[in-house]
Amino acid sequence: MAVRLLFPTYVFHRNFLDPNLDESQGYDLEYAEMLVNEVDEMRKRDPMGRNVSNSTSPTENYQAGWQSNDGCESNAIFQKCMNRISRFFQDEVLPFHGIHDSSGMRMKAGNSWANINEKGSFNRPHTHNGCWYSGVLYLKADGDEGCFVATDTDQKVLSMFPHHQRVKGDMVFQPKTGDIHLFPSGLLHMVEPNYTDKSRYSISFNMDMESVINNQDGKGNFGQDFSDPNYDSEEFVFNLDERGNPIR
């Protein structure tokens, strides 16, 4: 007996503090602390920030955290960070989607903003319009300041069913310092309330891809068909053992 996965959602993960990454793929804790300090300075320069998905509990007298306006991608202190994000996308996401020769293609954060989630603050369910992939990078997080929750909006069952981890409507991530998640922009997601006395720092971003053809910026061949004639259509088919678990 076998099971086939239909229409999976692809979420890519890396931790930029991983010591196994080379210098062009990650960074050290000292740089992470530098980013946190810069976010604090950004807040001093713009204490109001903006309210988009960031919210506060209606039953508690808490602030809604703080979200900057766009612009991290043009901040000199964030350039190393932005380069690492682009490299991650080039290394992992593009090859997975069949783009093995990315020469002439330039990945960058089209817009990026900083977040400080304080006690009681959370982010309402939302998607990111106008891009292919979005992401979040955690600059300072211990894992207990509110989970990142992705929600499956594709109805798979319309009646009663046995509860099991394989039939669930959401996936929960407990972010730690250095974690980065890249996800399709249409993935519905939210951030649970922070019930600790700590503040979590992160930056969110929307990825933009451009082709550079004859030194002219444009979408170029990004819209072309990258289908692989040798693609294995059975890659998401798994045989099951006697307990119903996939054999990998």
Enumerate the language-model features and the residues they cover.
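Catalytic core of non-heme Fe(II) oxygenases with the double-stranded beta-helix
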Residues: 108-182, 192, 209-221
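Double-stranded beta-helix
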Residues: 149, 207-248
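Ligand-binding loop in jelly-roll beta-barrel domains
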Residues: 188-202
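Short aromatic/hydrophobic contact patches that present stacked aromatics
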Residues: 13, 136, 204
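Histidine-dependent nucleotide/RNA phosphoesterase domain, centered on the 2H-phosphoesterase fold
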Residues: 104-105
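Non-heme Fe(II)/2-oxoglutarate
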Residues: 1-101, 122, 221-226, 230, ...
